[in-house]
Amino acid sequence: MGPGGYSPLRDASDQNRVKPPKSVGDVPRFLAELIRSFFGRLIYIVRLVWETGPWILVSLVGISVLSGLLPVVGALLSKDILNALQSVIEKHSQGVSVGLFWGSAVMLLLIFFFLYRIFNQLVNRLSTAVTRVASEKVVCHVKLQIMKKAKEIDLASFDMPEFYEKLENANREAGTRPIMVINATFDAVSKLISLVGYVVILATAPGMWWTAPVMVLISLPTAIITFSYRKKNFLYMRRRSKDRRQMNYYSDLMVNKDMVKEIRMFHLADTFTDRYREVFGHYYKGMRRLIVRENIWHIVTALLSSLINCLFFALIAFQVFEGKIRIGDYSLYTGALTSIASTVSSLINVSATVYEGTLFIDNLITFMKEKPRVVPMTDTP
């Protein structure tokens, strides 16, 4: 604690926490502060990556746009290939000559399709390479920022449990969270681009334009469940940080080369092992409860989504049966339905990952805001 019972780090952490609504009328204020807090943390992470190297953000933007457009392009090419093949079959059945395969429309479409496949693989490999290189650079930059900050902070702060816990958490999260959040953010952008493309495709389906908004609407319960339980998971891990430290302490003691002799000499191995099991039991019980409840809700929403998908597939098949659309169109529209469902699900999970990651980055933000309070009597030589 600071002078007069003042704990600067705890106060800073409290400032980052959005107060829950006191009434229904207070909900808009709560949502506005929640969104502002989320984007504030996200912008902080983007700034960290930009300081590391502007080329990282520029590369990720380009890759995310290509990754979003390519699946839609692939679906359109597949549709054209199937429709072209259907036309060939119809001409054969009518006894009409279709000419040589080489130089035909089918052959040309296949060339474009395999060029697309090659380009898609190149984009995926480029994405992996940029992510790996950027991860190393960002980790180094954030670690250096923490080291510089640790040099400036008062020595007395290191004796405060609240401060040391934040320092430990910030140092641990620095290795993964910033680049993970950035990758997830641009992954969400690419999925959003794909989603818009698939919605446009379904909007062109005769008499089926309304299926796209329905598919998006039935995904809203999944989004609410996912975001709600990500927040609960974060709060649970925050409350149980003491348990995780104890488990790390007991497990590290058992494999510490400097302590193993004393542990054997005083017969403490079973004691530490039992203590680890006991602490893990309390930690695991609450975590399991959260996981089970979340997945029960997800199973219910998945069953509802599957039933609606089956109905839409049958409606599109009926259009083919009536001769209103072709086989390639059936492949395109059903693929768009499936892709919308999977893309929305992935978009929700990725967005929840970004949201959860920005919550954990509070540890780093709070630590970096800590100010020295002891004024030196002389200048540093």
Regions found by a protein language model. Name each.
Residues 75-82, 143-147, 160, 164, ...:
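Alpha-helical transmembrane segments of polytopic integral membrane proteins
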Residues 57-123, 195-233, 307-314, 318-328, ...:
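Transmembrane helix-loop-helix hairpins at lipid-water interfaces of multipass membrane proteins
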Residues 1-71, 88-109, 123, 127-131, ...:
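Membrane-integrated ABC transporters
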Residues 239, 268, 312, 333-369:
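Cytosolic ends of transmembrane helices, especially the final helix of ABC transmembrane type-1 domains
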Residues 51, 169-181, 235, 239-242, ...:
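An intracellular "coupling" helix at the cytosolic face of ABC transporter transmembrane type-1 domains
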Residues 21-30, 145-176, 240-275, 350, ...:
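Short intracellular "coupling" helices and adjacent cytoplasmic loop segments at the cytosolic face
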Residues 74-78, 115-159, 163, 229-238, ...:
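Juxtamembrane helix-loop junctions of ABC transporter transmembrane domains
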